[in-house]
Amino acid sequence: MIQNRVAQYIEKEKLFCLNDKVLVTLSGGADSVALLRLLLSMGYTCEAAHCNFHLRDKESDRDEAFVRRLCHESGVLLHIEHFDTTQYATKKHISIEMAARELRYEWFETLRKQREASVIATAHHKDDSVETVLLNLIRGTGINGLLGIRPRNGNIVRPLLCLSREEIIAYLQYIDQDYVTDSTNLLDEYTRNKIRLNLLPLMKEINPSVKESIIRTTNYLNDAATLYNQSIGEARKRILTPEGIRIEALLQEPVPEAILFEVLHPLGFNTTQIDNIRQTLDGQPGKVFLGKGWRVIKDRDLLLIEEDTTAEESQPPFRLVMEEYDYTSEFIIPKDKNTACFDADKINKTWEIRKWKPGDVFIPFGMTGKKHVSDYLTDKKFSLSEKEKQWVLCFGEQIAWLIGERTDNRFKVNENTKRVIIVRIVSEHSDFIEE
């Protein structure tokens, strides 16, 4: 019986126990309906979670009405959440598919905790796993992308990976259980559906058992991936710093390309970008590569990895306090880098806080000649990322302070000074000077 196969799979993969509460993700489609009916018939305690993404007009409401009826007839507690998926996708600059995925899994986990469920059960099956392998191959992937869908990912479990789509449909027909059909699954519209409706039928002409062959291959690769991931984990410890990747250490590894892929691919960098990054390792610093929310900057000795903040900051991430004092023999000039001291009588123009820019010059404190800010920062071995984050305080057109770094000699205090201006960095996330 199909129940025995699913029960054996749950036990083999240690997905959950009979006394655990299972939160079943219920779309109303054949797969999720079969999952709920199977688990209930096997004696598991289930609650259901349904998402209404409002993407398919009347179909979305039809699906909700169906799962309400199904859960009512089955005596299953149902939880429903409505999402403005289009607005979320627009705000986050992601696809509708990705938006729906993020929204539903975030809500599933929140609901799981609220309901004290042990796991979230999704209805992925063998065919889904095969499609995932092919999709990853088409996009470009590492060894982990060839493993297909795994039985467990944290609190998310997939009890139906032991079944094919055909077996699921046959089971529903056997128990005379209806379900709803998502019309988009029948349209050659999304990439996964192109694989399902176009590519796989062609592959089956070459090998009628192609799905089973792919599943067997993923199982063989799983053991190899375990060893591979252990080696990658050890390599990460050798090459990574809090700022990024040590280039020299990476190049000493036996497979630097594979390590680079495993570090950067999860951050949204595709295979072409990673190849381009690899080719810059021996080159000059300065190149910037953008992933999805992250960027890599080729510096002298490091590949700097940081969140993408390329949009120009309109305000500095700190607050300055300006105070004026009489300059007497008892006055002690502060020495820390977060404080600047100026001769007040040399300041007769408005002040401005801004990012430094190419061509900026100043006279570093203690020197007599002008120096380009870019050269100063390079001499101080600032990384490219640190250079981008450097702000300056200007009086009129002249730079008075590389904030947090060094003041300009033209505004220094001397024996003729009568009044001093003290400027201090006192906190983050503000945009003005207090006087």
From Swiss-Prot:
EC code: 6.3.4.19
GO annotation, cellular component aspect: cytoplasm
Gene3D superfamilies listed in its UniProt record: HUPs (3.40.50.620)
Binding residues annotated for ATP, in chain numbering: S27, G28, G29, A30, D31, S32
Name of one Pfam family that matches: ATP_bind_3
Catalysed conversion reaction: cytidine(34) in tRNA(Ile2) + L-lysine + ATP = lysidine(34) in tRNA(Ile2) + AMP + diphosphate + H(+)
SMART domains on file: TilS_C
Coarse class of the protein's main subcellular location: cytoplasm
Example GO BP: tRNA modification
Subcellular location: Cytoplasm
Superkingdom of origin: Bacteria
Disulfide bonds: none
GO molecular function: ATP binding; tRNA(Ile)-lysidine synthase activity
Family (UniProt): Belongs to the tRNA(Ile)-lysidine synthase family.
Comment on protein domains: The N-terminal region contains the highly conserved SGGXDS motif, predicted to be a P-loop motif involved in ATP binding.
Record protein name field: tRNA(Ile)-lysidine synthase
Organism of this sequence: Bacteroides fragilis (strain YCH46)
Gene: tilS
